[in-house]
């Protein structure tokens, strides 16, 4: 169930009291969920921008709407002028342009991108920035980086040794019924990006790139069988943060068994990797969307808490998160978790927990502060049990 998001009556840092003006770019399912979450607190004055008028219909009273194309040349500057923060829920290819406008205006910037190149470009804007630039604020990348860093810190804080850190996340249909055993619950473009682009990892203490769809493994959680394989972008900036401090770090997407083989047929044998536009059209026309989904999160770290001493120790985090009903209707699991991630990042900047300018990594958020946050507590769920598949 969606936990109530109570007002906190934020005390603005160096600004007069009152709701902070935030702009949400993109009125898709996740953008609308973000807007409703923030508006419900009373601490944020929310404006939602989308180029399509039908997407803006039905917003709750009190949320301002504006029909405009934020990707049009020069439009973003006008849309963000006077805002305290912008939350970018547009496709990944819009990230750099929006972040550039935000940095120019001194507006705090948050996004959901999984695109590694976009994140690198945004980081180049950070030197001398007057505002926060914080990409990758969703589920993966996003929350999983917060979890991974917390697990790693348990071993490294007292001079210990981190041997492996495995992070696994899946946004899955509850009732798979096709050969892919998959339904669309989020951005098709983002999904294809994850399946086609190189994946960052740490192997043998060295930062490397590994191919997507490789590294297939099988396991079970709470008696349900899954597979997991390399996908791009899920680690965010964690490989850089843990470089030279961990032996092996990787991220894989969780799917039902058989999905990886089917995707290799499409991408490699049929060469749709070379025609991503075709693949997007096929997915959008042939794979049903679903509101009946579940998010599965599983992360495990192994090492020694004191350098060269003591027994080998394992620490884990796991959760299964479903959708929920709200006054505005059903919110599915991927919408809930993604929106909660970016809203928590915004809140932690607003309350001074995070830095107030420059590039901010996801792992800068302490896990306990994240889960205690009024938005972040959506992630507090019953842990899962792993068994060999």
Segments predicted by a language model, with ranges:
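C-terminal catalytic/substrate-binding lobe primarily of soluble NAD(P)-dependent oxidoreductases
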Residues: 2-10, 154-389
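Conserved N-terminal Rossmann-fold NAD(P)-binding element of oxidoreductases
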Residues: 22-26
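N-terminal Rossmann-fold NAD(P) dinucleotide-binding loop
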Residues: 31-32
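Helix N-cap at the beta1-alpha1 junction of Rossmann-like dinucleotide-binding domains, i.e.
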Residues: 52-55, 116
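Rossmann-fold cofactor-recognition segment
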Residues: 60-72
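Conserved Rossmann-fold cofactor-binding substructure of NAD(P)-dependent oxidoreductases
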Residues: 70-82
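Beta-loop-alpha module in the N-terminal Rossmann-like domain of NAD(P)-dependent dehydrogenases
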Residues: 74, 85-102, 116-118
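Rossmann-fold NAD(P)-binding glycine/threonine-rich loop
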Residues: 112-135
């Amino acid at each position: 169930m969606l936990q109530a998001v109570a007002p906190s009556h934020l005390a603005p840092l160096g600004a007069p009291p009152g709701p902070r003006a935030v702009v949400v770019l993109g009125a898709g399912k996740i953008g609308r969920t973000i807007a409703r979450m923030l508006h419900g607190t009373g601490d944020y004055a929310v404006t939602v921008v989308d180029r399509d008028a039908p997407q803006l219909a039905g917003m709750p009273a009190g949320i301002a709407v504006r029909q405009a194309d934020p990707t049009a040349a020069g439009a973003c500057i006008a849309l963000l002028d006077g805002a305290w923060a912008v939350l970018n829920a547009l496709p990944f290819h819009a990230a750099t342009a929006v972040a550039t406008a935000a940095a120019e205006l001194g507006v705090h910037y948050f996004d959901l991108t999984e695109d590694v190149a976009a994140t690198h470009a945004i980081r180049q804007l950070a030197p001398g920035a007057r505002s926060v630039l914080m990409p990758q604020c969703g589920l993966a990348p996003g929350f999983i980086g917060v979890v991974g860093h917390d697990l790693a810190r348990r071993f490294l804080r007292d001079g210990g040794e981190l041997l492996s850190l495995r992070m696994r996340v899946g946004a899955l249909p509850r009732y798979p019924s096709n050969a892919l055993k998959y339904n669309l619950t989020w951005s098709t473009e983002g999904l294809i990006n994850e399946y086609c682009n190189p994946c960052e990892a740490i192997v043998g203490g060295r930062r490397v790139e590994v191919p997507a769809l490789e590294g297939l493994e099988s396991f079970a959680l709470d008696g349900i069988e899954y597979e997991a394989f390399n996908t791009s972008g899920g680690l965010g900036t964690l490989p850089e943060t843990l470089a030279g401090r961990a032996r092996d770090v990787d991220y894989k997407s969780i799917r039902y068994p058989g999905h990886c083989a089917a995707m290799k047929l499409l991408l490699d044998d049929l060469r749709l990797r070379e025609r991503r536009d075709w693949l997007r059209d096929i997915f959008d026309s042939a794979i049903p969307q679903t509101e009946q989904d579940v998010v599965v999160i599983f992360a495990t770290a192994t090492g020694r808490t004191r350098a060269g001493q003591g027994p080998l120790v394992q620490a884990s985090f796991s959760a299964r998160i479903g959708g929920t009903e709200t006054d505005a209707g059903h919110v599915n699991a991927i919408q809930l978790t993604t929106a909660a991630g970016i809203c928590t990042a915004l809140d932690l900047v607003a309350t001074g927990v995070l830095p107030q300018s420059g590039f901010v990594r996801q792992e800068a958020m302490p896990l306990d502060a994240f889960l205690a946050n009024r938005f972040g507590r959506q992630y507090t769920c019953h842990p899962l049990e792993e068994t060999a598949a």
